Amino acid sequence: ADVPRTIARMIAAVFPRFDQKTFVRSSLDGYDALELMSRGWKIAHQLRHSLPDDYEKAVDILLASLDRKPERTVAQGMGGFLFLPHVFFVAEYGLEHFETSMRAQYVLTQRFTAEFSIRRYLERHQTATLSRLMEWSADSNEDVRRLVSEGTRPRLPGTGLRQCAWS
């Protein structure tokens, strides 16, 4: 239950019009009965209802709300899973906004792996995504390089990634 509350506080700090109470109440409705991944999806869907309809504005707010230090330990006891809903938000709502979503995944993966998100982009925008991942494979940040490795393994169980021309 701390994850939705923490996300609400983070967003409200940079977007004062954010309705924390409604977001938290909606996110926590049925929350305890859900597994971890389902909780992440539920919060991501509530973000869609609580942030501006304009995806690019919503992503700007989400990214602005992140702690300034891009360390996986910033979430304290929650671990990086605090950022799982952010990754799911990009996966679900950003497919038609390639550049904005790539920027978001680049930033987010430095806090929590964006592998769950990048796979949808490999399916929808295979050539452009592979090109970007090729650039990222030489990035100075190890988390970005790890995304390239983890996000392009289609045969792992539970990846949800169908066969691509390169697999």
Residue ranges and their predicted role:
Residues 1-167:
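Surface-facing alpha-helical segments and adjacent helix-coil boundary elements at the starts of domains
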